Amino acid sequence: TKLLLAIDLGASGGKMFAGRLGGDVFRMEEIHRFEHEAASFFLPDSSGAVRERSCWDDTAIYREILRGLRLFRRHVGDRLDALGVDTWGADAQWVDADGEALGKVYCYRDHRLDNMVEEVRARISADRLYRLTGIHFQPFNLSNQVLWFATRRPRLLAAAAKLLPMPTLFNYYLGGCTQVDSTWASVTQMMDARRRVWSRPILAALGIPRRVLPVIVPPGSRVGLLQPALAQSLGLNRAVIVAVASHDTASAFAAAPADDPRDALIISSGTWSLVGRLIPRPVTSAAAMAANISNEGGIGNTRFLKNCMGAWIVQELLRVWEAADGRRMSWEEVDRLTPAAPPF
């Protein structure tokens, strides 16, 4: 029996599942769940102007991952064969040649990205960008984020040795791994959708050196082992770290309970709702571009989908109501009250 651990990180919370694979039977149980959210910082820039910045607390998320690993040790055992991390499909951390973080991890909802789509399009035509990547145009695409750093923080970019996407960042904390799988790389709007490599024309247009980007590997690749000292501190063996389908929607689509996923309409709903289907290869026609449909990497296929609003509106309402009266409403309470609420 193989003992596995899945670390599923969304934009508002995380879940960790212990899995047992033996013969033709796979069993899974949730062992840890936690909430997290971006924090607002009010930071002065080089001009002295104070600007609000929205950043992730990657240290807090990492601490919760360690808590989940300790719970695995307590409830499952001291043997762990493999683990994998998936995350939301935006944001990354810069590290220097010594492995030190260069600043905070910006959140994709930070307003510095509001006009970046237009800046990217000014450097490479929208038609060409879509033909190469098949990715829709959204402010949070990593292409917009790296252009912002290249144009607004050139000294940081000059000091950077590597850009670590969110799943890679936590694999790096756990085992020093710096690879990214193709499902996550696809949503950056910098990967060639057909060749599954970083697109040189796009990198040249954005002014991003290829050396700072991680190596792209197929989902399911073994990329490292738990650091020895970390494994010892957790009472575990040096488990294999796998670059899974690390864009959370890619993993969700792969696990969709459909008789034939190729003929199914799949909806993956969380903070965002992703609606689409699996197709053999990208469709980058003018009609697909006009509909703002994405061709995101899958496991041997392409996720042809539309990005829709999910539970984020409800999450924000819960946050505002808690700030107003100091009481945190549970999701169970939301479920109970929703049917009785008057329609708009």
Q: Where do the language-model regions lie?
A:
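N-terminal glycine/serine-rich phosphate-binding loop of ATP-dependent small-molecule kinases
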Residues: 1-103, 131, 231-241
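Active-site core segments that coordinate phosphate-bearing ligands/cofactors
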Residues: 5-7, 18-20, 121-133, 144-179, ...
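Glycine-rich phosphate-binding loops at beta-strand->alpha-helix junctions
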Residues: 13, 218-226, 246, 273
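Short, acidic/turn-prone active-site loops that include or flank metal/cofactor-
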Residues: 33-34, 39, 106-113, 185, ...
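Short beta-strand-loop/turn "lid" adjacent to the catalytic site in phosphate-handling enzymes
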Residues: 48-53, 72-108, 133-142, 171-192, ...
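Phosphate/pyrophosphate-binding loops at sites that engage ATP/ADP/AMP, CoA/4′-phosphopantetheine
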Residues: 65-81, 152-157, 200-210
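Pocket-flanking alpha-helical
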Residues: 93, 115-119, 252-254
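A structural motif shared across PLP-dependent enzymes of the aminotransferase-like
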Residues: 109-119, 139-141, 191-200, 219-228
